[in-house]
Amino acid sequence: MTAASRANPYSIVSSEEDGLHLVTMSGANGFGNGKVHTRRRCRNRFVKKNGQCNIEFANMDEKSQRYLADMFTTCVDIRWRYMLLIFSLAFLASWLLFGIIFWVIAVAHGDLEPAEGRGRTPCVLQVHGFMAAFLFSIETQTTIGYGLRCVTEECPVAVFMVVAQSIVGCIIDSFMIGAIMAKMGRPKKRAQTLLFSHNAVVALRDGKLCLMWRVGNLRKSHIVEAHVRAQLIKPRVTEEGEYIPLDQIDIDVGFDKGLDRIFLVSPITILHEIDEASPLFGISRQDLETDDFEIVVILEGMVEATAMTTQARSSYLANEILWGHRFEPVLFEEKNQYKIDYSHFHKTYEVPSTPRCSAKDLVENKFLLPSANSFCYENELAFLSRDEEDEVATDRDGRSPQPEHDFDRLQASSGALERPYRRESEI
């Protein structure tokens, strides 16, 4: 079989690039490992950092008819200026339509002739031309009621048209108010106050490599039944040679144990344990520098005020995942309450003792974990640096700082670990 016959007409890459994918995407577990390291291909983000999906629809059959068939959803989804323009045109069209009808009735009844030549009661009083008929239409639909123009019993058709215009006006008003209230009450804007960390990190947690990212709520109102989920999106070539440009793979964030449901009062670090079932099981730090994938993270819940479901989204490319880093603490106990410092929300500090190999190599005992004392030492340094900042602030207020017995005890217990004291941001 020739190369031309193997070419996929639906593939977005050339046949040479297909061959490259076959080499770099194969692995023992289907997700990586055993790769030939090449330079990273520049890929487009599928989900932007602000949650918008980077897609564009094209060649849709009967798009206008389908959108008009669901007019209410169309009005809710479009921008405010377009929605207000549509309703303004709807009002003008209805006023103009019934104005023309009343003018035609007046012409047919002879109401536009001079008063001395008529000799009978007009259908609509004080309507002597099209402009007067148009004003009468506006007064009828908006119930202004100036009192100069009114319909008489002379023409039943005119009475029927007044009733019809009143019904049409109520329908337009109801539709407009409903669409505006639905648009204003949408929980979409609630996602603007739900925050994701700029980067995700990979570090050890309880002796296992874990992928972590941080979420936060900028409002005091809660997100009811908040839960998170994540998906890994990457191109893949099947065993039959089919190229899938955006293959979606679920990432477990503790669904079976209920860990995906969170109480989002303070910022929380979401954790994905990189185990045998993880798509990141065979990826090491070196693989992370050359791999081509995107992790989409989703936070869902109900808005406390309206009980409507909202969804916040973000994503992390491979170069936005920091290997061997941890997030700086943002929650501190202060007097009789807890203080959340969002200036540290996106900040991380490096943990040099994090293994550079993949989780698969760790399971196969190809990497010797450092002693637990080293991790404890780094964690205590991080918190002691925070205590030092509190003591400096206390000294500025004129109160004597507390003695630094904790740090002396740490230096005495560290033994062979002769490291100089550094601030948290330098770890």
Swiss-Prot record:
Chief subcellular location: membrane
Location(s) in or outside the cell: Membrane; Cell membrane; Cell membrane, Sarcolemma, T-tubule
S-nitrosocysteine modification sites are C75
- Tell me which residues bind K(+) 4: G145, Y146
Recorded GO MF terms: inward rectifier potassium channel activity; metal ion binding; PDZ domain binding
Q: Which GO terms describe its biological process?
A: potassium ion import across plasma membrane; potassium ion transport; protein homotetramerization; regulation of monoatomic ion transmembrane transport
GO cellular component terms attached to this protein's record:
dendrite; membrane; monoatomic ion channel complex; neuronal cell body; plasma membrane; T-tubule
Regulation of catalytic or functional activity:
Activated by phosphatidylinositol 4,5-biphosphate (PtdIns(4,5)P2). PtdIns(4,5)P2 binding to the cytoplasmic side of the channel triggers a conformation change leading to channel opening. Inhibited by Ba(2+).
Q: Which UniProt keywords apply?
A: Cell membrane, Disulfide bond, Ion channel, Ion transport, Membrane, Metal-binding, Potassium, Potassium transport, S-nitrosylation, Transmembrane, Transmembrane helix, Transport, Voltage-gated channel
Q: For K(+) 3, which residues are the binding ones?
A: I144, G145
Q: In which tissues is it expressed?
A: Highest level in cerebellum. Moderately found in kidney, forebrain and skeletal muscle. Not detected in uterus, liver and pancreas.
Basic and acidic residues composition bias: residue spans: 393-409
Task: Tell me the intramembrane segments.
Answer: 130-146
Q: What reaction is this protein's catalytic activity?
A: K(+)(in) = K(+)(out)
Q: Enumerate the transmembrane spans.
A: 78-104, 156-183
- Report the family membership: Belongs to the inward rectifier-type potassium channel (TC 1.A.2.1) family. KCNJ12 subfamily.
The record's note on quaternary structure and interaction partners says: Homotetramer. Forms heteromer with KCNJ4. Can form heteromeric channels with Kir2.6/KCNJ18. Association, via its PDZ-recognition domain, with LIN7A, LIN7B, LIN7C, DLG1, CASK and APBA1 plays a key role in its localization and trafficking.
Q: Which PANTHER family match?
A: ATP-SENSITIVE INWARD RECTIFIER POTASSIUM CHANNEL 12-RELATED (PTHR11767:SF14), INWARD RECTIFIER POTASSIUM CHANNEL (PTHR11767)
Q: What protein name applies here?
A: ATP-sensitive inward rectifier potassium channel 12
